Amino acid sequence: MKDTTVTAQFAIPAADWKVLAEKADLPKEAWGKPCFVAWTTTPWTLPSNVALCVGPKIEYDIIETYNPYDAEKLTLVMASSRVAAYLKPEGEITDGGELPPYERGDKYVPYRVVARLTGTELEGLHYRQLMPWVKPVEKTGELAPKFVNDYAAAHPEKVFTGEDGRDRFVEMESEAFRIILGDYVTTEDGTGIVHIAPTFGADDAKVARDADIPALYLISKKGETRPMVDLQGKYYTIDELDRNFVKACVNEKAYGHHAGDYVKNAYDPHFNPNGIWDKKASEKAEDLNIVICMEMKQEGTAFNIQKHVHNYPHCWRTDKPILY
């Protein structure tokens, strides 16, 4: 199937850039905004991102360039072998001179590679949450991983009880949004950096848990930990969520902008009149992936947006794309 994909910019905080710059023997002040870039075919999962995964032996370039949409100065990190997929060789500056200015619409984007590191050298660096709609949270107790209970014990101010008074949860924002290692990362496509959303994939869940990364769950009115997308294929509405969880972990304005939106048109009742899926109409209409990508472009967090043909699992009975 053909989907709208995005290569997202995950901003690197100043303190982590200084660590990265020291490893790469670069100035403490980055050229423009420093970012890790990661590609995804499912932009609707980006609000649930909690980590970025790199291959331990893969080489990664640090590149000074511009955002092709708004010409913002950027310092990017991506796999060395994937640079040519995003930046034309005609734009590379190799003589050590200053990058020429860039304006949107120019034939190519100027860039230069200033350093190269392995994935292992990137491990542990942090980045800013791309879409700070919801803070990561975990349920504490006997069945919780040790790192969750240890964190809750060390940070009692982060612990809260569900509105039904039964279960206790801990907000774990500080433990997420960092670079982790994964042997399954490849450089066949994308940037060589994988966006990790544990609630939407078994591989993501395993690599995150192995690295003590908390998941980004929502907590329902019933006190259940749930992915951001419900079983009808839409983002949960705020009134379906535990009030104490919302108070502790949800940016109501940011999340509320898309609360209740269907992540695939195939599940939207508008395209299922009388329970019959109008496949042609749903595929023709703009879907949430496109909306999210356009919002990212306006916010300056999208480095590349394009259509991509790929294999995606579908239900054999309804022919609809599978979400879980």
What is each PLM-predicted segment?
Residues D16-F36, P43-Y324:
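Non-cofactor substrate-recognition interfaces
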Residues M1-K2, W31:
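Short, ordered beta-strand-loop transition motifs
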Residues D3-T7:
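A contiguous, basic/glycine-rich beta-loop/short-helix subdomain that forms a polymer-engagement track
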